[in-house]
Amino acid sequence: MRHRKSGRQLNRNSSHRQAMFRNMASALVSHEIIKTTLPKAKELRRVVEPLITLAKEDSVANRRLAFARTRNVETVAKLFNELGPRFAQRAGGYTRILKCGFRAGDNAPMAYIELVDRPEVSTETATTE
């Protein structure tokens, strides 16, 4: 019985799951929005939110903890240089999940997961000149 076992298995072994969420966390930190399946997005929240909370206080120990969890130097740099200061006044809830329909091949529910205070992307073109 799997009573009181938290987290989703996602039909993967533990090392595959750990590597997948490590890669997805790095992608989310670098791009600030990614598209994935809904269960993966919900589980990714549990990985990324503590990393951003860790980045709010910049110290060598916290940087080493973040590197141990992501294994990516660029991700750690962006976490502590950009995201930590950006979310300094926010007490949790750094991500948002937006459902976006179903995948064509297998009808899996898809979702965007994004950082909430993401800078607005300019949609203006060069035709305004």
Swiss-Prot record:
InterPro entries recorded: Ribosomal_bL17, Ribosomal_bL17_CS, Ribosomal_bL17_sf
GO biological processes: translation
GO cellular component: cytosolic large ribosomal subunit
Protein's UniProt keywords contain Ribonucleoprotein: yes
Keywords, sorted A to Z: Ribonucleoprotein, Ribosomal protein
GO molecular function: structural constituent of ribosome
Subunit structure: Part of the 50S ribosomal subunit. Contacts protein L32.
NCBIfam families referenced in this protein's UniProt entry, alphabetically: L17 (TIGR00059)
Family: Belongs to the bacterial ribosomal protein bL17 family.
Name this protein carries in UniProt: Large ribosomal subunit protein bL17
